[in-house]
């Protein structure tokens, strides 16, 4: 009996703001996908250059949408609201897909029972002239077992949004991008998704991510403040169980993430991680004492236990 091949519609969404220099290469890479059951939605976020002229030159090969400028998150949301696909795939206007990006990820889904898993991979960095710089391969640093743990790759800054293939149902269940966030709208939403969804790391490199001068126009201070809020929010929202799942213990998780935050200059978040580490240590200390007291009461009775407590107090004052 011939096995049914899973071939759902995939929506490739390309948000563009003043992207005339690179967007044609991005659109061409989407059109060149070996997987053909796709729709390509280009969202013009109020561009003032030749973005519209370039987009319209593709005719009915793409779905073109125009909106007033509102930021990348709002442009992505516009595309999501208009897409028909069972899966969402983001392509930045200055990035490029490998021809087999979508096909390869759908082939992975064909091998999995759970079709609502988020698939992601590594990526290649290129310069403004499309010359290759180097590849970012998370599996060179971590095992696949760790890379398949929900939240692990996100909290190690291993996720590039354009590598993801996301089930559309997650937008229906969780929501869309927070349009008030200019720099962290992606990780803010991935955090919500990864807490409720299984993830699957694939070792293939399937996209090219471009580095160019136009990306440095944002003020560093504004970015820093938003990233500080992002990481502080993560720390406050994570449960004890999630920390243990990621690092084996809450203390190890907080210690490791404190190092990461300090290294990346997120001082406020770093200080919060240190404070939480101290709280966990103190909390664990008192929990240990209470456990010892209960054990002593059950085994030795109240008089012996009181004597032990007195000795503990004297010892702690030395």
From Swiss-Prot:
InterPro entries: Glyco_trans_2-like, Nucleotide-diphossugar_trans. Keywords: Glycosyltransferase, Transferase. The keyword Ribonucleoprotein does not apply. It holds the Pfam family Glycos_transf_2. GO terms for biological process: biosynthetic process. Disulfide bonds: none annotated. Its EC number is 2.4.-.-. One of its GO terms (molecular function) is hexosyltransferase activity. The keyword Transport does not apply. Belongs to the glycosyltransferase 2 family. This is Uncharacterized glycosyltransferase RP339.
């Amino acid at each position: 009996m011939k096995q049914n091949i899973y071939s759902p519609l995939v929506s490739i969404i390309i948000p563009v703001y003043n992207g005339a220099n690179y967007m044609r290469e991005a659109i061409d890479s989407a059109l060149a996908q070996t997987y053909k059951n796709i729709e390509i939605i280009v969202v013009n976020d109020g561009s003032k250059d030749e973005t519209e002229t370039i987009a319209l030159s593709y005719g009915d090969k793409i779905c073109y949408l125009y909106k007033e400028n509102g930021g990348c998150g709002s442009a992505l949301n516009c595309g999501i609201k208009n897409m028909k696909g069972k899966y969402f795939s983001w392509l930045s206007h200055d990035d490029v897909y490998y021809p087999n990006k979508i096909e390869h990820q759908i082939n992975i889904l064909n091998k999995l029972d759970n079709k609502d898993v988020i698939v992601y991979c590594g990526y290649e960095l290129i310069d403004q002239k499309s010359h290759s710089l180097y590849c970012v391969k998370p599996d060179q640093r971590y095992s696949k077992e760790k890379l398949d743990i929900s939240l692990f790759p996100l909290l190690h800054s291993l996720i590039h949004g354009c590598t993801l293939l996301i089930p559309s149902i997650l937008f229906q269940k969780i929501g869309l991008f927070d349009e008030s966030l200019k720099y962290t709208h992606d990780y803010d939403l991935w955090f919500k998704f990864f807490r409720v969804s299984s993830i699957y790391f694939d070792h293939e490199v399937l996209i090219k991510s471009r580095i160019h001068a136009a990306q440095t126009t944002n003020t560093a201070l504004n970015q820093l403040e938003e990233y500080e809020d992002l990481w502080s929010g993560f720390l406050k929202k994570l449960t004890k169980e999630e920390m243990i799942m990621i690092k084996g213990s809450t203390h190890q998780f907080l210690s490791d993430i404190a190092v990461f935050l300090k290294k990346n200059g997120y001082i406020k978040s770093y200080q919060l991680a240190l404070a939480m580490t101290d709280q966990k240590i103190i909390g664990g200390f008192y929990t240990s004492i209470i456990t010892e007291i209960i054990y002593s009461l059950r085994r030795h009775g109240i008089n012996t236990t009181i004597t032990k407590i007195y000795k503990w107090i004297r010892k702690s004052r030395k």
